[in-house]
């Protein structure tokens, strides 16, 4: 199974409760513990200016899109062994779909 459109409102709540402590969304907002997510879609792993990535993130070499995010967000450490992202992942497909649907609009 892969990405399917979700509920952006539920995704916003997931972002607020599971992601916002480490990530920002807006253009020009700084990095926190994790990188700023503005312009996420179409960007390559390990490429946000001013953020200190692990070699594993830089070497992964994939482009973030709905499908790569869907797989990554299930278990970040499995998808990119060596990442410093401490988040354990979202195991439910629906939660990942909702979050990615929210991120599509909020990271433009």
Curated annotation (Swiss-Prot):
A single cellular component GO annotation:
mitochondrial intermembrane space
- Location of the protein in the cell: Mitochondrion intermembrane space
Q: Which InterPro entries does the record match to this protein?
A: Cyt_c-like_dom, Cyt_c-like_dom_sf, Cyt_c_1A/1B
Keywords tagged on the record: Electron transport, Heme, Iron, Metal-binding, Mitochondrion, Respiratory chain, Transport
Offer an example of a GO molecular function term for this protein: heme binding
What's a Pfam family in this record?
Cytochrom_C
Broad class of the protein's primary localization: mitochondrion
**At the top level of its lineage, which domain of life is listed?**
Eukaryota
- Renumbered to this chain, the signal peptide range is none
**Post-translation changes:** Binds 1 heme c group covalently per subunit.
Which SUPFAM superfamilies did the record assign? Cytochrome c (SSF46626)
Q: Where does heme c bind?
A: 19, 22-23, 85
Q: What does this protein do?
A: Electron carrier protein. The oxidized form of the cytochrome c heme group can accept an electron from the heme group of the cytochrome c1 subunit of cytochrome reductase. Cytochrome c then transfers this electron to the cytochrome oxidase complex, the final protein carrier in the mitochondrial electron-transport chain.
Q: Which family does it belong to?
A: Belongs to the cytochrome c family.
Q: What is this protein called?
A: Cytochrome c
Give the organism, scientific name: Stellaria longipes
